[in-house]
């Protein structure tokens, strides 16, 4: 059994002082994986949005993204360090800090395209147990879920040679984008790759599409999801805003 040491704290504000709740887990990981999520979910507020007759509630913390982030912290941490994995929850964001910096050659900029599992056997065990669909794809799923729920992409500020600091914001940025994705359709979104989601996000924000993503642009144009509006400029398709 994989032994796991974690501290989970909840703070209602970011000011210094004692946490409102603090839980410590020091046992086999499979025995506390659900308990850790359940503790987070106790303070997982729903954000309510309405646009005409269109009404929906979005959890502040996506279960899929949070679970993937925990699995990443456990499978990629440096076990030569005696430190624990820390989970710090605030009303609108969650931080996960794991011992050991990013593996050699991995940066926040290339983390989606360069997989280097520090503990391959743990990652493979998670895949065999069905906790992850495919070893090495956890961060991709986190990015996709952040875009799908219109929340800021993962933030690695505070990461250094000794710790990986991952912050996931729970703040929904634009309900109109959520409605756009709803009209695109869940079945269609299931066929999207990580690159497809990133392109849609760049088009939504009016930013140039990076060169390493452009190979997927024709597919999204053919699907009617984005439109070209100038040289190297794209926008979300107008048909889904009507």
Regions found by a protein language model. Name each.
Residues 1-242:
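C-terminal regulatory or interaction extensions
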């Amino acid at each position: 059994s994989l032994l796991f040491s974690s501290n989970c704290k909840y703070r209602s504000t970011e000011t210094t002082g004692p946490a409102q709740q603090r839980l410590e887990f020091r046992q086999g990981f499979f025995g506390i994986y659900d308990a850790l999520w359940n503790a987070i979910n106790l303070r997982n507020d729903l954000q309510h949005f309405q646009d005409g007759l269109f009404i929906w509630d979005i959890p502040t913390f996506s279960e899929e993204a949070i679970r993937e982030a925990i699995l990443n912290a456990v499978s990629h941490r440096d076990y030569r360090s005696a430190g624990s994995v820390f989970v710090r929850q605030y009303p609108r964001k969650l931080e996960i800090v794991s011992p050991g910096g990013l593996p050699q050659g991995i940066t926040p900029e290339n983390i989606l395209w360069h997989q280097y599992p520090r503990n391959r056997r743990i990652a493979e065990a998670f895949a065999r147990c069905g906790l992850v669909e495919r070893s090495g794809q956890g961060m991709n799923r986190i990015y996709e879920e952040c875009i799908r729920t219109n929340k800021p992409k993962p933030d690695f500020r505070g990461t250094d040679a000794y710790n990986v600091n991952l912050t996931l914001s729970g703040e929904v940025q634009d309900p109109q984008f959520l409605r756009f994705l709803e009209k695109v359709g869940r079945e269609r979104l299931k066929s999207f790759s990580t690159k497809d989601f990133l392109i849609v996000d760049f088009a939504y924000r009016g930013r140039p599409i990076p060169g390493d993503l452009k190979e997927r642009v024709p597919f999204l144009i053919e699907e009617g999801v984005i439109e070209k509006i100038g040289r190297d400029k794209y926008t979300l398709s107008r048909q889904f805003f009507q």
